[in-house]
Design a protein with these regions (language model features):
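Long, distal/terminal scaffolding or interaction modules
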Residues: 1-212
Length: 212
């Protein structure tokens, strides 16, 4: 609870033969109230994963019920199944769920969020200074670039890091077929968060024009 920096890595023992996608590796309320830092879990988290997360970046291979409840910031990537009531009360941050079977819409609480397809990488944006290009070991900023853009790039970076830190077989498989895998992710975007970001962007544009 309350992670405020650093990195947490929890992975399967080398001799383990169990399937990480069916194995609960961390318990309930992990990353509750986290404000910064990063965490990678090679397995499934229990209930209320990343509740009230306000800035941590994390990858996990499945969650129990009520994941990302009341989340206000940060980035969460789920490479497996989620429980029910995902994103209830989520007002900020972004999440991505791998959803090859198309079941996530029935497990997500969509009262405050929109579910979107992940936008493909855009080569024309390669030189954009806001693009998340940090493929190094550390996360340079909790937002990882403009939350309204760069979904494919952001996702790939985090799946790469998850594989680097945990040796995850699921991450390796996704990266090996990334062109198809990225299309099976769903982005969870809070409605009020998007509106606030668009308003801030509009205000910055007006300020730049006025300065000219």
């Amino acid at each position: 609870k309350g992670l405020s920096g650093g990195r947490i890595v929890v992975k399967q023992p080398p001799e383990a033969r169990r399937d990480p996608l069916a194995n609960i590796i961390v318990g309930n309320t992990v990353l509750y109230g986290a404000i910064s830092g990063e965490a990678y879990f090679e397995g499934v988290a229990g209930e209320r994963f990343a509740v009230r997360n306000s800035g941590a970046v994390t990858v996990v291979e499945g969650t129990g019920d009520h994941g990302c409840e009341y989340m206000t910031g940060g980035v969460v990537v789920v490479l497996g199944e989620t429980g029910r009531n995902f994103a209830a009360g989520m007002s900020g941050g972004i999440a991505y769920a791998y959803d090859p079977a198309g079941r996530f819409k029935d497990l997500c609480n969509a009262a405050m969020v929109d579910l979107e397809a992940v936008a493909a990488a855009d080569p024309a944006l390669a030189e954009d200074p806001e693009q998340p290009r940090q493929r190094s070991v550390t996360v340079e900023n909790s937002g990882m670039g403009d939350p309204l853009r760069f979904d494919a790039e952001r996702l790939r970076i985090l799946v790469e890091r998850h594989h680097m830190h945990t040796g995850s077989a699921r991450a390796r498989a996704l990266l090996g077929d990334w062109e198809n895998a990225v299309k099976r992710f769903v982005k969870v975007m809070p409605k009020d968060y998007r509106r606030a970001l668009l308003e801030m962007k509009s205000e910055r544009q007006v300020s730049r024009v006025a300065a000219e």
